[in-house]
């Protein structure tokens, strides 16, 4: 069994407990009362390279990263530094996240918020919307094609922007066929946890120009952002280097400044 399979088994077990506590109808009622979702595609398009900043306590590959007693405060620092989107881990067993983290971040910041989890059912999409998310992660490797297509369609129908994660060229083809408008290329293989920094450079050319391209994993500073930008990235997702650093606001500001450099102003209308 791969690491991804183990994570999803845990996700399904935790999901069953939440479904027993909160009905789908109740979630839909909460979602209807949530403030309208912000446009995730619009947040990631435009001149330069946008920065998605992550609230992340731990990971399967590195273990504990940061305690993050105040996720809302961290998110506020990210926003003040110029982040375009805040990513919030809500998977509990391996990443130490929760829907409570999503609630607190949503209440604190005005920019779009991404629920980052292992989504396998539409119930989780309604959860995301009920807790104020504007974007949601869908991992191609975790889903059969009919499920991927259905989840993208359902997410968009309730206002969520799917960030569809891929790891190789075959998964890009699946994501494009499923109608993805934003594709994230993760340099970390979730089945083995190995990182290949060349993944984005190899995979990005297969992504059509009209789709927003996000580089995930391996961003430690402005030099990495610039490298990804030169390979065609419209945005980067940054987590570990921010939560383990001493001054996340300044670190984000430095990344944003690099992304706004005139040499990188390759935005599309």
Swiss-Prot record:
The keyword Amino-acid biosynthesis applies. GO terms for biological process: L-tryptophan biosynthetic process. It catalyses: 1-(2-carboxyphenylamino)-1-deoxy-D-ribulose 5-phosphate + H(+) = (1S,2R)-1-C-(indol-3-yl)glycerol 3-phosphate + CO2 + H2O. Keywords: Amino-acid biosynthesis, Aromatic amino acid biosynthesis, Decarboxylase, Lyase, Tryptophan biosynthesis. It comes from the Bacteria. GO terms for molecular function: indole-3-glycerol-phosphate synthase activity; phosphoribosylanthranilate isomerase activity. Its EC number is 4.1.1.48. Pathway: Amino-acid biosynthesis; L-tryptophan biosynthesis; L-tryptophan from chorismate: step 4/5. The keyword Lyase applies. Belongs to the TrpC family. This is Indole-3-glycerol phosphate synthase 1. It comes from Streptomyces coelicolor (strain ATCC BAA-471 / A3(2) / M145). The gene is trpC1.
């Amino acid at each position: 069994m791969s690491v991804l399979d183990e994570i999803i088994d845990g996700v399904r077990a935790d999901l069953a407990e939440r479904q027993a506590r909160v009905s789908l109808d109740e979630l839909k009622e909460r979602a209807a009362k949530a403030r309208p979702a912000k446009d995730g595609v619009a947040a990631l398009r435009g001149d330069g390279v946008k920065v998605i900043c992550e609230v992340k306590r731990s990971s399967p590959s590195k273990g504990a990263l940061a305690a993050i007693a105040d996720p809302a405060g961290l998110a506020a620092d990210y926003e003040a530094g110029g982040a375009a989107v805040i990513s919030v881990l809500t998977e509990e067993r391996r990443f130490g996240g929760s829907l409570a983290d999503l609630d607190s971040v949503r209440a604190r910041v005005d920019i779009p918020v991404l629920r980052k989890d292992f989504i396998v059912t539409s119930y989780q999409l309604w959860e995301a919307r009920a807790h104020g998310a504007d974007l949601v992660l869908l991992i191609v490797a975790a889903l059969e094609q009919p499920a991927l297509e259905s989840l993208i369609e359902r997410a968009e129908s309730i206002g969520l922007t799917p960030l569809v994660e891929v790891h190789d060229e075959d998964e890009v083809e699946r994501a494009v066929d499923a109608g993805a408008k934003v594709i994230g290329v993760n340099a970390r293989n979730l089945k083995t946890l190995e990182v290949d920094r060349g993944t984005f450079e190899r995979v990005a050319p297969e992504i059509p120009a009209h789709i927003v391209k996000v580089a995930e994993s391996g961003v430690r500073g402005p030099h990495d952002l610039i490298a990804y930008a030169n390979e065609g990235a419209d945005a980067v997702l940054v987590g570990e280097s921010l939560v383990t650093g001493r001054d996340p606001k300044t670190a984000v500001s430095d990344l944003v400044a690099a992304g706004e450099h005139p040499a990188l102003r390759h935005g599309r209308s």
